[in-house]
């Protein structure tokens, strides 16, 4: 098995390279907050020497309640993304939900994300593939790791091989997610870069009356476990006031903890990738 390397400017994304951070906020709440969060991430990752891609959503189309905040929408969201890109010289990742969104988003954003709940929607997959952008595929909570090959094949047949696979937990009974660490290793056997969404994996789907709950207190433990696998990247969301975040606050890392958190993750990644591989199949 050979590891595929995806190049994004000077950033190399691969399972055998130093990990890349995909981080930011869940949803764009305001221009000012997005700029504050992007600046904090940029400063911390530059200090620690971690390759970094800023993440946020312009629309959360799968909220538990019709009354929940969804975001500023695509037009306003892309303006904010462009300002972040220009101000901090950061590459960007965001998710799309409809085929018509793919091309305009790809004109601003570097990596387009396929949401877990939509990962089998062929029309969306094809529209994303045709942009030529790098694609981050969130593994659906209801799919086995080996079934990701079908989604990969769809993208390949639509002409796109620039694919990242992202683990974000699997359904375990009602209102609960668990992370199968061996499943991430199984996805790595594809050769494609695998990243770990360590904050969404903390979700308790439908765990509150009209929104998802979460286990923010365990954010460090879960991420440490994932980083021990030697992954291409870590995906996290942070907020200066998680208890009052407009989406997924119960899973968000407190922004003031970002440097301490990433210092530990980098140390684990550096250590694991310094080891020689051991083939225990023989």
Swiss-Prot record:
Q: What is the lineage of its organism?
A: Bacteria, Pseudomonadati, Pseudomonadota, Gammaproteobacteria, Alteromonadales
The pathway it acts in is:
Carbohydrate biosynthesis; 3-deoxy-D-manno-octulosonate biosynthesis; 3-deoxy-D-manno-octulosonate from D-ribulose 5-phosphate: step 2/3; Bacterial outer membrane biogenesis; lipopolysaccharide biosynthesis
Q: Which SUPFAM superfamilies match?
A: Aldolase
The gene it comes from is kdsA
- HAMAP family hit by this protein: KDO8P_synth (MF_00056)
Pfam families reported for this sequence: DAHP_synth_1
EC number(s) for this protein?
2.5.1.55
Where does the UniProt annotation locate this protein?
Cytoplasm
Pull one GO CC term from this UniProt entry: cytoplasm
| Name under which the protein is recorded | 2-dehydro-3-deoxyphosphooctonate aldolase
């Amino acid at each position: 098995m050979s590891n595929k390397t995806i190049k994004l400017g000077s950033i190399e994304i691969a399972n055998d390279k130093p990990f890349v951070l995909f981080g930011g906020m869940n949803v764009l709440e305001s221009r000012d907050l997005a700029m504050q969060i992007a600046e904090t991430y940029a400063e911390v990752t530059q200090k620690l020497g971690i390759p970094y891609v800023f993440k946020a959503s312009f629309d959360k189309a799968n909220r538990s309640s019709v009354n929940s905040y969804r975001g500023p929408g695509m037009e306003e969201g892309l303006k904010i993304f462009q300002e972040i890109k220009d101000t901090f010289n950061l590459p960007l990742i965001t998710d799309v939900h409809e085929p018509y969104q793919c091309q305009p988003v790809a004109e601003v954003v570097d990596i387009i994300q396929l949401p877990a709940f939509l990962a089998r929607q062929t029309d969306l997959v094809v529209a994303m593939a045709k942009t030529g952008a790098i694609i981050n595929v969130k593994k659906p909570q209801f799919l086995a790791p080996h079934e990701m090959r079908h989604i990969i094949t769809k993208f390949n047949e639509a002409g796109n091989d620039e694919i990242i696979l992202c683990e974000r937990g699997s359904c375990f009974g009602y209102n609960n997610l668990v992370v199968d660490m061996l499943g991430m290793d199984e996805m790595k056997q594809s050769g494609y870069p695998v990243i770990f969404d360590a904050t969404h994996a903390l979700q308790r789907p439908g765990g509150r009356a009209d929104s998802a709950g979460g286990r923010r207190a365990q954010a460090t433990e879960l991420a440490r476990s994932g980083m021990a696998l030697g992954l291409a990247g870590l995906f996290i969301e942070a907020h200066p006031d998680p208890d009052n975040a407009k989406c997924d606050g119960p899973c968000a890392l407190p922004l003031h903890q970002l440097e301490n958190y990433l210092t530990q993750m980098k140390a684990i990644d550096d250590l694991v990738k310094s080891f020689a591989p051991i083939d225990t199949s023989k």
